């Protein structure tokens, strides 16, 4: 199904009914609204103006639209900030952030918790049983604009309490953090400060605990709202819209309190921000990288335990990337179908009409500010017609499982040991290779059940907890583990048995030395798939296992014991492709090399093919299959769907 984000408070009331009628005529079923409307609902303290929202919801019901109502807590009004200035967050440089944007609150603020409880309870009590309201979105894009980690006095006190609960005694904390180093020993939890503004780098264990604490604070704030909504809005779903390429919080943990996950898909903006070579950014400037949206669909399907929405889908140029090109004709339709192929229950577009004012006036919508339709309007009209004629089977399991860990991103942010080491870059490289091989990927948190997958990929897992080791030991298929896995304990220390730590139960080897390589300094390796150049990262390994791939100086780079493999370097694109292709063939997954820009996705017996490229491509469909959308020749920025039994 399809939906759209709408802001009735931005438009004259006489437009509302006309807009809702146009939404239904377009084929939209859902409308999200209200997530930034606190000042419109309560312009002065206690003076609640529900009337306009009452009328909006009644009109939506009349026109057959289902409403996802946002809690308005991402934008506390000016009067609230003036009354409680301490709710404003403090940045890493110790500066109090000002009113005038959005997300201007601290998750640890007691005053803001109280005000949140008041407005959310009032909203849920009034609309939790309204027939138009089918669900709630909690807040909006937790952590956007760098707001997960705050450095205010409230956070300091909350962090001290978090540490007391975790460690019990200050001696336990000192041992865990190794505070004997640089004379950092604490006598009491009340002496612990937030890890910022230090002369030299802060203690990495201190930083990691603070990152964990900050993520936990967001989760607690979300759960706090969820509980209020559950109490007052029976039978309504609750979700939150996560972001792309964002690791400051743990989405798997937060989503445990939601009915499903949602995310905001802006393929062009994300591609412009990705650490890609400039030629690739130009190549995909109007389409988005072929794997950027798919990666997040699969990630948030995993986060949502099999269920996800796209709450905001890009319909035109955005306003927040360094460069903001317009999508190529056909791409809004392609992105929509791709989300559906990956299992999205709803694709909702941002926004119905481009705002003529304020910060997002340069961000396109379905309609221009003069009320005339934009290009995306007609592409979505076509999708709605196609959807009505194409029954969709349930999405099944993929053949490849990938283990994703936000904590790993935190570890490498704190201690990268090399400027080019980026966790998400490594993860995305693995994911993208399997997409180029025509294979689907399911994404899991560490410790999730991995049975039934022919191939399990762990790009890097520095902290290997007991449940993660158990899940890997019980996996049915081949398991490939990437560099720096098992390199730290939960306390952010080198494990006593040295890396890969607990993974030595599966892979009897020791990483005895590591190095990071600057750009241009390359090592060469050779093996059964050819000769490859390596950069970024290398490890020296002691083991009795024979290496499958060697550096030219004799050091091993790839080791195997039974079903388990360890990769002791940052893989070059060429090696990664050859390795993953070989493992997929061994696992019986039938990989195939797709033309550049072509991607496949199965949904039950349906096979979707998406052409991100500028040329016509041939659909890799068996002879005689029936095409349900398109045909064997797929034009640029188009798709085809066929059925395979």
UniProtKB/Swiss-Prot annotation:
Enzyme Commission numbers on file: 3.2.1.23
Q: Quick one: which residues bind Zn(2+)?
A: 106, 150, 152, 155
Q: Which residue positions are annotated as catalytic? A: 141 (proton donor), 312 (nucleophile)
How activity varies with pH is as follows: Optimum pH is 5.0 with ONPG as substrate.
Which UniProt keyword terms apply here? Glycosidase, Hydrolase, Metal-binding, Zinc
List of residues binding substrate: 102, 140, 320, 360-363
Establish whether keyword Hydrolase is in the entry: yes
Catalysed reaction(s) here are:
Hydrolysis of terminal non-reducing beta-D-galactose residues in beta-D-galactosides
- Output the Gene Ontology cellular-component terms: beta-galactosidase complex
- A GO molecular-function descriptor: metal ion binding
- Matches recorded under InterPro entries: Beta_galactosidase_C, Beta_galactosidase_Trimer, Class_I_gatase-like, Glyco_hydro_42, Glyco_hydro_42_N, Glyco_hydro_b, Glycoside_hydrolase_SF
List the SUPFAM superfamilies hit by this protein, alphabetically: (Trans)glycosidases, Class I glutamine amidotransferase-like, Glycosyl hydrolase domain
Temperature dependence is: Optimum temperature is 70 degrees Celsius with ONPG as substrate. Stable for several months at 4 or -20 degrees Celsius in the presence of 10% glycerol. Activity increases continuously from 30 to 90 degrees Celsius and drops dramatically at higher temperatures. Retains 50% of its initial activity after 1 hour incubation at 70 degrees Celsius. Retains 90% and 50% of activity after 30 minutes of incubation at 70 and 80 degrees Celsius, respectively. The residual activity of the enzyme decreases to an undetectable level after heating for 30 minutes at 90 degrees Celsius.
**Main enzyme class:** hydrolase
Q: Does the keyword Cytoplasm apply?
A: no
Which Pfam families has this protein been placed in? Glyco_hydro_42, Glyco_hydro_42C, Glyco_hydro_42M
Give GO terms for biological process. Answer: galactose metabolic process
Q: Which residues form a coiled coil?
A: none
The role this protein plays is: Hydrolyzes chromogen 5-bromo-4-chloro-3-indolyl-beta-D-galactopyranoside (X-gal), o-nitrophenyl-beta-D-galactopyranoside (ONPG) and lactose.
PANTHER family reported for this sequence = BETA-GALACTOSIDASE GANA, BETA-GALACTOSIDASE YESZ
In the record, the note on similarity to other proteins reads: Belongs to the glycosyl hydrolase 42 family.
| Descriptive protein name | Beta-galactosidase BgaA
Q: Which organism is it from?
A: Thermus sp
Biological classification of the source: Bacteria, Thermotogati, Deinococcota, Deinococci, Thermales
